[in-house]
Amino acid sequence: MNRLATGTAMHPAMTARTVTRGSVQQAVGGTAAMTQVALTARPITNMGMPGTRAVGGQRQVLDLGYYTSELRNLITATNKEAEALSKQTIELQKREGQLQRQQESLHAIQREVDELQGELQDILYSQSRLSENATLEDLRAEATEAESAASKTRNEANIAYKARVDAEERLRKNEASAVHLRTEMEAQIESTLGLQAAERYRSLNDENITLKQKESELRKELQEAAAVAANAYSFCTILSNYTSGGSISGQPGHIAMDERISGVDTNIQKAITLHRQIRAAKRELDAYKAKIKAAESHDPEQSLKQQLRNRFRVEQMETQSLVEEIKITESGVQQRKKLLEEITPDATVTITKEQKDLLKSVIKAEAFLVEFPNKKLALQTSIKQAQAEVVNLISRLPIPQGTVSVPGEENPGAIEAQLQQKSRELDRTTDTEMRVNAELRTYGDKVSALTDSLERLRADLRDAESIENVEAEESTLKTKLTSLKAMHEEETKTLEKSKGALRLIEDQIAANENAQLLRNLLDQLSANLQKKYAVELFIVQKTIESCYDEPKKKCLQLVSEINNILMGG
């Protein structure tokens, strides 16, 4: 019977030799011979597969079956995760649909609420007007006026919208033309002067724009100061005329001067009123300017328009400065041409070959210095690309078959999957623990309730220990119950009699005309009381609104101060 050779069996030629009579047996020594080698401690390899299979389950062979089983486990884990994710996505989609439906219903409810609030405001306004003894015709007239005002506002809004659309179209055209002009100017600058000159030109233009803005602001401030000074000068001249006229008016024979003084007084009053009106107008103008600035700051279209206008102005300034620079360069070129024409007849010295080579080398060095940064960047990018390709190739390399691996080693993806699974199990256990704790609390509450009921029953049993006392109490309770029943029957009879008498009285009252008149009078009285209360509230509100004591005091104080100033001046 043939027997397969295992991986650990000895070769037939390597069998132990028989010991002869003259041979000497020596003990084997050394660290290699004394070390004890276990079969399970040997490394895992792909060599000697039949022998390792014959040994049994002591060693694990990294063959095709091992890797296929690992891949199947990973595939099942990924499929489970994909199913869980798909379930979560379905639930989220359902929640999103529910939320969208709730939002739509909320918007519909808000619209209905707004409509109802508008109707309520209309009803309250009409009720207040009717309480003010207004007629339906007045209300209809007010409604028609409101409709006409609304139509006017709609027309104005439509006109404003059309103007806005036209302005946007004009703005787009201006933007396109400005962009085209700017590109042409930039190309011309770069072609004629170079990049450095163009950048310097732009920076100077920006500085020029800022300086012009500051100049315009200073001019405005100067104009305002001049206007204030002119007003003060006119006011001083009026006061000087008034004082000079006052000194002469007391003398006899100056009737015309007195008339002039009276005219001056009127002029002073007019000047004061005009000065106040001018101040009020300036305040209103400042308020309107502030509102316009706030609206422009909040309006992105206005800011965009302002930016485009500033750009257009900058480009205009750039073109003007560019034209001036071109003129300057042309004049410089003409001067250089003249100098060259003067120098050429005097240039009798010939350039040697060495000088020409030196000039060429200098030109090449300058070109290399100019192109060096670009070449450096290109080389760095190529090095980075090569490193990335090397990393990709290393990642794509297969696992070597003959390498030694440690038993029990797992894929990091599988470890992560196990970690996620353990975390899920931990979450489930925490949920179950919380649920169990809640159930234990409910059971504890039930047990406490049962113990309370048990204590009550025990107390009742203690009270009812003696049967005789219970029977005596039962007899007394029966007698009380019979007496209460008799009293109840008597009271029900009296109640029925009183009900019959009440019905008769109600019928008599309903048939009586005086009672009906009294009811009508009571209703009218309640309505009149409500009207009176509303009128009183209206009177109180109007008295509060029409109280001008404090403004009157302030006005009188201002008038007295003005008079004191004028008389003192």
UniProtKB/Swiss-Prot annotation:
Q: Which domain of life is it from?
A: Eukaryota
Q: A Gene Ontology biological process annotation?
A: intraciliary transport involved in cilium assembly
Q: Does the keyword Coiled coil apply?
A: yes
Q: Which family does it belong to?
A: Belongs to the IFT74 family.
GO CC annotations on file: 9+2 motile cilium; axoneme; ciliary basal body; ciliary pocket collar; ciliary tip; cilium; intraciliary transport particle B
- The source organism is Giardia intestinalis (strain ATCC 50803 / WB clone C6) (Giardia lamblia)
PANTHER family on file: INTRAFLAGELLAR TRANSPORT PROTEIN 74 HOMOLOG (PTHR31432:SF0)
Q: What does this protein do?
A: Component of the intraflagellar transport complex B (IFT-B) involved in flagellar assembly.
Keyword Coiled coil part of the UniProt annotation: yes
Q: Which residues cross the membrane?
A: none
Which cysteines are disulphide-bonded?
A: none
Primary location class: other
Annotated protein name in UniProt: Intraflagellar transport protein 74/72
Q: Where in the cell is it found?
A: Cell projection, Cilium, Flagellum; Cytoplasm, Cytoskeleton, Flagellum axoneme; Cytoplasm, Cytoskeleton, Flagellum basal body
Q: In the record, what terms sit under GO molecular function?
A: beta-tubulin binding
Q: Which residues form a coiled coil?
A: 75-156, 201-231, 271-298
Alphabetic keyword roster: Cell projection, Cilium, Cilium biogenesis/degradation, Coiled coil, Cytoplasm, Cytoskeleton, Flagellum
